[in-house]
Structure formats: structure tokens, C-alpha cells
Curated annotation (Swiss-Prot):
The gene is proB. Gene3D superfamilies: Acetylglutamate kinase-like, PUA domain. Its main location: cytoplasm. GO terms for molecular function: ATP binding; glutamate 5-kinase activity; RNA binding. This is Glutamate 5-kinase. It catalyses: L-glutamate + ATP = L-glutamyl 5-phosphate + ADP. Catalyzes the transfer of a phosphate group to glutamate to form L-glutamate 5-phosphate. ATP binds at K14, T173, D174, T215, G216, G217, M218, S219, T220, K221. One of its GO terms (biological process) is L-proline biosynthetic process. GO terms for cellular component: cytosol. It holds the Pfam family AA_kinase. Belongs to the glutamate 5-kinase family. It comes from Mannheimia succiniciproducens (strain KCTC 0769BP / MBEL55E). The keyword ATP-binding applies.
Amino acid sequence: MEQKQNSQKTIVVKFGTSTLTQGTPKLNRAHMIEIVRQLAQLHQEGYRLVIVTSGAMAAGRHYLNHPKLPPTIASKQLLAAVGQSQLIQTWEQLFAIYDIHIGQLLLTRADIEDRERFLNARDTLHALLDNRIIPVVNENDAVATAEIKVGDNDNLSALVAILVQAEQLYLLTDQQGLFDSDPRKNPQAKLIPVVNEITDHIRSIAGGSGTTLGTGGMSTKITAADIATRSGIETIIAPGNRENVIADLAHGEAIGTKFTVQTDKLESRKQWLFAAPSAGILTIDQGAENAILEQHKSLLPAGIVNIEGRFSRGEVVKIRTQQGKDIALGMPRYNSDALYLIQGKKSQNIEKILGYEYGSVAIHRDDMIVLNK
């Protein structure tokens, strides 16, 4: 994996309920103070940080003085609705000590599965990071229509890591990492420091569900690690109660279990773009062709001379020269109807023409794969 300087390195840190409560029935404020101290240190060093936080249901249960509720989805959603405000308020108060701003994102599966909403979430996350604001992400359990399954936030953290093109994902839990057998049952269990491939054997030793306060377990962390590493993101399962664990991980110390990347980000994106069906064709002028092939730049609306097909924002399209040669695949930031209106126009006029804008480019370089040079 290509190493980045701190000022460019993006890390997603997922905090399980057990890490935030430290074995108590409520958020452990003293421990969260220590967590925020480490994150503030890394933020000041130039790291780009994203928090994926559990703990809403535990916070809600404590705030309501541990009510006796039936074991239903509605009860879980009630606790999440009450606890989410308590959870985000705690994060906000602690980061304010260091004069660091946070921004809250509540996501559901629909936000990830719907391409338009997926792109909106990605744009919001990048906007926050670009303005040195730490995103705090959680599953929107209070309004989710599907059942709250085990490990949603583990999988969500992997998807968020993909959204922000992170270098690393830290899954902090109440375990030291992945062991060769269950350490709660076998005192001779040994920690596995590095996993280079997630095999059926690795999945089988991961075990089952987690604590009663949360919804996560080791097996879901393995699934999250699989998702992330296949997208070129190194993943580490580490003990959330270890002193200075986040800062030490960021600085390269070997802690917990590291899952090495299965492919680099570029190769992962290539595979996805190549596999996706083409929904349309953008024919570009010579200037745009040179910008893409020689200067490695994004495609601007001004360089588009013709549009074929009807497509949504984020669907894959071919980028074709006026000589009929396909030179790239890409995901446009605007749908075909919008591109018809802004093709050949200067980027500064996009908002005037459409009444809104998703940025100055038609296809960003990060959302493009060059086929031939």
C-alpha cells in the first residue's frame, strides 16, 4: 500500500458499544475523554478522521433509567431515537474542548444501496473532511425499516471507509483482536497478529454475537474487514481499552489483528467499473481528450460535445473521442438530463443553468478509469 503523509492519510475509526461503555450500562465519559484526546492529537497532526459510532441504544437505555421493554425492533428503535441525541452531544462536548467541530451523519442501508444517495453521502463526507470537520457516522436505527441486524455498524464502517477512500479502518472492540479460538472459553487461545487472507477457517474461528448492550460480534468484524480489504483498505481489529491505542495504531505500532489489503484501491475501482454495464456515452472534444490522457485531469462539461443514452448520476458511462475511440469509463456527477443542459458550457455557469450544482466537473478524475493511452 502506498504510504501517505499524515496530512493526506484518512482513517476511519469504529467504536463498538462495549468500547464506549467499558463494561458499564452507560457511556463511559472518562474513557471517551481519553478517546477524544487521541483523536484530537491526530487531527492536529493532519490526519483526516472519520468516526463510526455505536452506543445510541446504550445511551438511550441509561437516559430512560433502564426501562423494561419488550424485545422488539420498536423497542430498539425507541432506545436509539432517545440515545442518539445523548451520544452525539457527548462527542460534541468533548471535541469542543479542543476547538474541533464535528458533523453528524445518520445513514440507512437505503442511503448506501441507492446510487444517488450514496454519492450525496460521499460528497458530504468529503466536504466535511476538506473543511477539517470530523464526521461522526451512525446507522439511523430509529427510522430503519429493516431489522437491526448484528454488526450493522461494523459493515457500515467498511462502507464509510470506501466512501472516503480511507487508507485504514480501525475496528475497536472489547477483545484484543482475533484469536485462534475463543479466549473467553480457552485461556490458551493465541492472538493472530496478521491475516493476509480471510478464509473459511478465519471466519469459523471468529465466533458469534457480541454483548447485550450492542449488536456487534467478531464475525461481523471479519465481514467488515473482508469488504474493506477487498477495496484496498487495511483493517485492524484492536482493543478499545488499551492506552493510546488509536494514536499508536496511526503511528504504525502493531496492535491487535491486522488484515492486509487484498487489492489496491485503483485495481478495486477498475474491477468495479469494468464489471458495471455502460449506461451511456459522452463524446468529448480534443481539448478534453488531452486533459484526460496527458494531464490526468477531470472531465469538465465544456469538453462534452455529445451525449448518448439516459443515465442517472453515478452510473457508468463511456468517454469517447470524436474519432469514435473509447478512452475511459467514468461515473458522472450529473444525470443525462442535466448534462444535456450543461454540455459545452463553462463550469461557472452550472448553477445558473441547473439551479444547483454537484461541483464543477462532469466526471471527477477519482471516478474515472483510462482504458487506452
